[in-house]
Amino acid sequence: KIGYVPQNLYLLDASLAENVAFSQWGKTIDEARVKKCCQMAAIDFLADLPEDIHTVLGERGVRLSGGQVQRVGIARALYDNPDLLLFDEATSALDGAAENEIQTTISSLRSSITLLIIAHRLSTVAECDIVYWIDKGRIIRSGAPGEVLPEYEATLHQSAFSR
């Protein structure tokens, strides 16, 4: 099973529980599972919600910050207990502080789930075990971040000054 956290998450004008259990729409929601996924996704704003997981989030999650929306996306992806969790530019729309919070959340999941992270921000992949530098569909280099990222940065720097 694969869980997916997109760059732009769509939230329903529904409760937090319904948004987390979105993949099981129409079925009975496992509230204990929703709470466990919220905990795993470091959703720390549950106590601030007037009706806990039953609080309606508003159209596209208007009552939440960008970082909170992404955490709901992570909880949603975790609800089906995936073997692999795919993050597709999941932090690109966030400011630095929110990105750091989400990075901490992602790091906490590394021990229990295989993570595949697609990102342009180098800080997003700096803690990964293996980094693949892909250009035009080809793997240019792979290895530990400490090996691949400096070479990638040097190439970016060189191409910026050769224009």
Identify what each model region corresponds to.
Residues 27:
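Catalytic strand-loop-helix junctions within cyclic-nucleotide turnover domains
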Residues 157-163:
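ABC ATPase nucleotide-binding domains
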Residues 24:
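A short, flexible helix-to-loop-to-beta junction within the catalytic ATP-binding CA
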